[in-house]
UniProtKB/Swiss-Prot annotation:
Binds phosphatidylinositol (PtdIns). The gene is CSR1. Residues 85-104 are annotated as: Disordered. This is Phosphatidylinositol transfer protein CSR1. Non-classical phosphatidylinositol (PtdIns) transfer protein (PITP), which exhibits PtdIns-binding/transfer activity in the absence of detectable PtdCho-binding/transfer activity. May also regulate post-Golgi membrane-trafficking events and have a role resistance to oxidative stress. CDD domains: SEC14. It comes from Eremothecium gossypii (strain ATCC 10895 / CBS 109.51 / FGSC 9923 / NRRL Y-1056).
Length: 436
């Protein structure tokens, strides 16, 4: 089906929403050490961030310092890459390890700076660009902004929490790039067992064209794996589901099949972890969550769980009992046969990838060529974003916004080329259901 971008995306912004997005980029560029004149978009409550002075300024940024707001000096400085995406972090000055930048704090964003004080701008910048799959940079940021109801300060703090988590705790890039074979090679038996059971499978698409994650809680027993292995398995599934997202679809549907569920399967720890992930680190990624065929023992459990949920997430949850209920949202051809649908897929048929499809993982020359192209697109995107922020008329702003969208498409297409060089082929790649 033909899809159009939903409200609050870069393709559909109102004038006020566009201003908030500009403010987000100004604050990010400030932390990355990129010069931009944000005076036209920052309000009285949000004074323009002052750039850090001296050597500290030089330590920040994905593509080096920007020497002025416009002109040749800026373009020249953009040509000097300071930290490469997916590569080891690099900085311009040899004394980088001795001195970390201390950006001037902006009123209302003190918590953000506190959260990121142990990280430098290059690390945060690198993580931002590497967490993109086929999504657009602006739309990734807008997830956090929408989740915080367009409150710039709350959105920036949420983003800071999530970036720090990705760098220091969750490390989802390591998990998804290593894939199922990564868990097997690391001898993480609990993760391997969950994969072999087919506890959660990305399969099919709903009526909006968004991927479905089919979960069978009856297969879960807490003793089969550690809590850490359950969390890592959950992150693997979430990140693999992200690979199925293609603009303008930016959410996934989760179908919890509770047939056969008993108290022996109940485990509150992973439920809490998933709630935290979706609310704090993957905002606006959940489209709909179906709890299907809940047994009579489930209401007391639900009474506990619903108190942990943010109202926005809770509003996306629906209880269903029949295939007809599901067919309001999911085509019959995409509903598992065992639930009364027409999809005859074998959900017990997981096969561990043997690595034979990972032919490009060792091709450093090919990877370098695609990364060089990616760096160039990102540099052009940053320049276009600065011109968009600094534009002095609605017409000029619209022109640069359109340019940003075009470059976002290029970046998305580039990731499709880059993916086999950095990510081990998953079960979904091998069986042909995933086409990044």
């Amino acid at each position: 089906m033909t899809q159009t971008a939903a409200p609050g995306r870069v393709q559909t912004l109102t004038k006020e929403q566009e201003k908030v997005l500009k403010q987000v980029w100004v604050h990010l560029f400030q932390f990355w050490g990129i010069d931009v004149d944000g005076s036209a978009v920052l309000t009285a409550k949000e004074p323009e961030p002052a750039a850090p002075s001296g050597k500290g300024r030089k330590l920040l940024g994905l593509f080096g310092k920007r020497k002025d707001a416009t002109g040749a000096a800026r373009k020249e400085s953009n040509g000097k890459a300071a930290a490469k995406v997916y590569d080891a972090e690099k900085v311009e000055d040899s004394d980088a390890e001795k001195e970390k930048p201390t950006p001037q704090k902006v009123e209302g964003l003190e918590e953000m700076y506190e959260l990121l004080k142990e990280l430098d701008g290059a690390a945060v910048s690198k993580e931002f660009w590497s967490m993109l799959r086929c999504d657009y940079p602006d739309n990734l940021l807008l997830r956090f902004v929408r989740a915080r109801k367009w409150d710039i300060n709350k959105a920036m703090i949420m983003m800071a929490h999530s970036l720090r988590w990705r760098l220091n705790e969750g490390k989802p890039e390591d998990i998804v790039f290593g894939g199922e074979r990564g868990a097997q090679k690391a001898d993480k038996k609990g993760i391997v067992k969950q994969l072999e059971l087919g506890k959660a499978t990305v399969r099919g698409f709903d009526k909006n064209g968004c991927p479905i994650v089919y979960v069978r809680p009856r297969l879960h027993h807490a003793a089969d794996q550690t809590e850490a292995e359950t969390s890592e398995y959950s992150l693997l599934i979430i990140e693999q589901a992200r690979l199925f997202l293609k603009e303008p679809c930016d959410t996934a549907t989760i179908l919890f099949d509770l047939s056969g569920f008993s108290m022996a399967n109940m485990d509150y720890a992973p439920v809490k972890f998933l709630i935290t992930c979706f609310e704090a680190h993957y905002p606006e990624c959940l489209g709909k969550l179906f709890i299907h065929k809940a047994p009579w023992i489930f209401p007391p459990i639900w009474n506990i769980i619903k108190n942990w949920l943010d109202p926005v997430v809770a509003a996306k949850i629906a209880f269903t009992k029949t295939a007809a209920d599901l067919e309001e949202f999911i085509p019959a051809e995409q509903i598992p046969l065992e639930l009364g649908g027409k999809d005859e897929y074998n959900f017990d048929g997981f096969v561990m990838p043997d690595g034979s499809a990972d032919t490009k993982l060792s091709d450093e020359k090919g990877k370098a060529a695609v990364l060089e192209e990616r760096e160039a697109i990102i540099k052009r995107f940053i320049d276009a974003t600065i011109s968009w922020i600094e534009s002095t008329s609605d017409e000029e702003s619209a022109k640069w916004l359109e340019k940003k969208i075009d470059l976002s498409k290029e970046l998305s297409e580039n990731y499709s080329k880059l993916d086999p060089y950095i990510r081990s082929r998953s079960f979904y790649d091998v069986n042909g259901t995933l086409k990044v």
